[in-house]
Amino acid sequence: MLILTRRVGETLMIGDEVTVTVLGVKGNQVRIGVNAPKEVSVHREEIYQRIQNEKSDPSSESGNF
């Protein structure tokens, strides 16, 4: 794992097309902005896990009884 230190307003690059910018820090929360091409999915980890679980178990989708 690469560990970086950034201040508010500073940006890091992932590849040539994805940027992550620190927008603010308040207590133990950090606001970040992500700029990425439309074909690159960007999700919080818990949302990503939910999407993966729904892909692996289609019967778990709401409305399917």
UniProtKB/Swiss-Prot annotation:
Major localisation: cytoplasm
Domain of life: Bacteria
Alphabetically ordered keywords of this record: Activator, Cytoplasm, Repressor, RNA-binding, Translation regulation
GO biological processes: mRNA catabolic process; negative regulation of translational initiation; positive regulation of translational initiation; regulation of carbohydrate metabolic process
Compartments, as annotated in UniProt: Cytoplasm
GO-annotated molecular function: mRNA 5'-UTR binding
Classification via Gene3D superfamilies: Translational regulator CsrA (2.60.40.4380)
Record-linked InterPro entries: CsrA, CsrA_sf
GO cellular component, one term: cytosol
Keyword 4Fe-4S belongs to the record: no
Protein family: Belongs to the CsrA/RsmA family.
Assembly: Homodimer; the beta-strands of each monomer intercalate to form a hydrophobic core, while the alpha-helices form wings that extend away from the core.
Function: A key translational regulator that binds mRNA to regulate translation initiation and/or mRNA stability. Mediates global changes in gene expression, shifting from rapid growth to stress survival by linking envelope stress, the stringent response and the catabolite repression systems. Usually binds in the 5'-UTR; binding at or near the Shine-Dalgarno sequence prevents ribosome-binding, repressing translation, binding elsewhere in the 5'-UTR can activate translation and/or stabilize the mRNA. Its function is antagonized by small RNA(s).
Protein name: Translational regulator CsrA
The organism of origin for this protein: Shewanella denitrificans (strain OS217 / ATCC BAA-1090 / DSM 15013)
